Amino acid sequence: MAKVIFVLAMDVSGKIASSVESWSSFEDRKNFRKITTEIGNVVMGRITFEEIGRPLPERLNVVLTRRPKTSNNPSLVFFNGSPADVVKFLEGKGYERVAVIGGKTVFTEFLREKLVDELFVTVEPYVFGKGIPFFDEFEGYFPLKLLEMRRLNERGTLFLKYSVEKSHR
């Protein structure tokens, strides 16, 4: 099965979105582009897609939605199905890794189906009083192993790479 990788940025309290404009750093955006371009695809929810406003270039963009539309753009697919269905779809297209980029509902659905192998998390040096958490509640837990930790800039933006312990996948 393809490796499922969550790619996200958050504040230090775990919020992935806020009313603050442009809070993710240049270094995070550059790192995100490099990671997801190498993987070759991004899976996101409809709201995340609408916030981005366009398909991300050089990647197959899969938008999970209950009301799929047709697209004339070969790099954009609207998909109505479960996380397992979208992983199978991408495997059928030859992808060995799947980059899940949010939002909260999509992350939660993948967690509930225990479909996550790695997390690539950028922690930006902010604390948001209001915002959207990384995920909703779900049953169980995922023990993680830190594979990499890098400081991306002088402000203290951190990149953390975790794997989900094999016994829990």
UniProtKB/Swiss-Prot annotation:
It is an enzyme of class 1 (oxidoreductase). PROSITE patterns: DHFR_2. Keywords: NADP, One-carbon metabolism, Oxidoreductase. NADP(+) binds at residues 9, 16, 46-51, 65-67, 81, 103-105. CDD domains: DHFR. GO terms for biological process: dihydrofolate metabolic process; folic acid metabolic process; one-carbon metabolic process; tetrahydrofolate biosynthetic process. It catalyses: (6S)-5,6,7,8-tetrahydrofolate + NADP(+) = 7,8-dihydrofolate + NADPH + H(+). Pathway: Cofactor biosynthesis; tetrahydrofolate biosynthesis; 5,6,7,8-tetrahydrofolate from 7,8-dihydrofolate: step 1/1. Coiled coil: none annotated. Highly thermostable. Residues 3-169 form the DHFR domain. One of its GO terms (cellular component) is cytosol. Substrate binds at residues 7-8, 28-30, 54, 59, 101. GO terms for molecular function: dihydrofolate reductase activity; identical protein binding; NADP binding. Its EC number is 1.5.1.3. Key enzyme in folate metabolism. Catalyzes an essential reaction for de novo glycine and purine synthesis, and for DNA precursor synthesis. Belongs to the dihydrofolate reductase family. Homodimer. This is Dihydrofolate reductase. The gene is folA.
